[in-house]
Amino acid sequence: LCYYRHHAHGDPFLWPGLNDITAFVDFTAVAEAGFDAGLDVQGYTTQAQFLFNCGVLDCLARRGPQESAGYIRAARAVQRLTAPQEMGELFKVLALSRGLEGPLLGFARGDRLHAL
């Protein structure tokens, strides 16, 4: 599915470079293929939880005064990326690795490996 200016269409070659292209991913199949290839599944979570775990709110707080235009733009972007009704719950993050020790920051809380 593709989006251009908030309108859905099915041709990814229409307006190249300007479309947002969305794919529905079978993360269980990806995790299984990674495991079969000798990779470890390090974590699986929502985009929102991943960004919160990685400190997106701390980054936002460093943007400057909350009334500044830059802060307001950044806050809107964080809202769009993390809100459950926006991209926060719909988009997911899966990490595969080989030989990596220890937990990854992005999966410190809210890991959903059990859901795969």
Model segments located where?
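Long, Lys/Arg- and hydrophobic-enriched amphipathic alpha-helices
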Residues: 1-116
